Amino acid sequence: MQPQGKMKKPTAEHMINENIPFQKVFVIGANGEKVGVLSTREAIEMAKEQRLDLVLISVQPKPIARILDYGKFKYERKKKQKAAKEKQTVIQNRQIRLTPLIGEHDLNVKARKAKEFLLDGDRIKVSLKFRGRESARPELGHKTLEKFYKAVEDLADIAKEAELVNDRFLDMYLQPNKIKVNKYRKEHNLVDKNSDSQDKSVSEEDTNEGEQ
């Protein structure tokens, strides 16, 4: 028999001992053995005799509770979650800004920075801005983006081809290619690392461009 009315689904922290909202549960012992169906009261007493807790671990298709040290259980679970989180690679979206008439030196500076992002596993938005009458020459922008991609294609794939946005920006999206990245690392004796640094987005103002 279950409680009357619509029951608010409790969190795991609430579903222990006297807070278990069922009169009977299928009990699993402290060593993983199947005890069987008991009244919740009996199961709680059994747990207390062992100085442990009765924890509801499942409600479908039937209520299942396990006898364990809930404090230790929470600690171990938190520890595992933290370890799993640390193993995750944080993928960030970076940005590189260009202009159609960017000089060779500055293009190479941008490409080197882009390679740092790609080696960290980040995606890149390459945004080329047309200024003044440059918007009448979109082919210049495409040519610059093609040149930029050639400088980083040993690490990247084009995730999205160059597209004109608001008649002022030509945006292209790049993503790291794992096979290319691994090959590059081996060739350059680089150690893999997870990037947790702050946004490294670069604008043309961040580099010393030569006179055009």
From Swiss-Prot:
Its main location: cytoplasm. Residues 190-203 have a biased composition (Basic and acidic residues). It comes from Mycoplasmopsis fermentans (Mycoplasma fermentans). GO terms for molecular function: ribosome binding; translation initiation factor activity. PROSITE patterns: IF3 (PS00938). This is Translation initiation factor IF-3. IF-3 binds to the 30S ribosomal subunit and shifts the equilibrium between 70S ribosomes and their 50S and 30S subunits in favor of the free subunits, thus enhancing the availability of 30S subunits on which protein synthesis initiation begins. One of its GO terms (biological process) is ribosome disassembly. GO terms for cellular component: cytosol; membrane. Belongs to the IF-3 family. Residues 190-212 are annotated as: Disordered. It is found in: Cytoplasm. InterPro entries: T_IF-3_C_sf, T_IF-3_N_sf, Translation_initiation_fac3_CS, Translation_initiation_fac_3, Translation_initiation_fac_3_C, Translation_initiation_fac_3_N. Signal peptide: none annotated. NCBIfam families: infC (TIGR00168). Monomer. Keywords: Cytoplasm, Initiation factor, Protein biosynthesis.
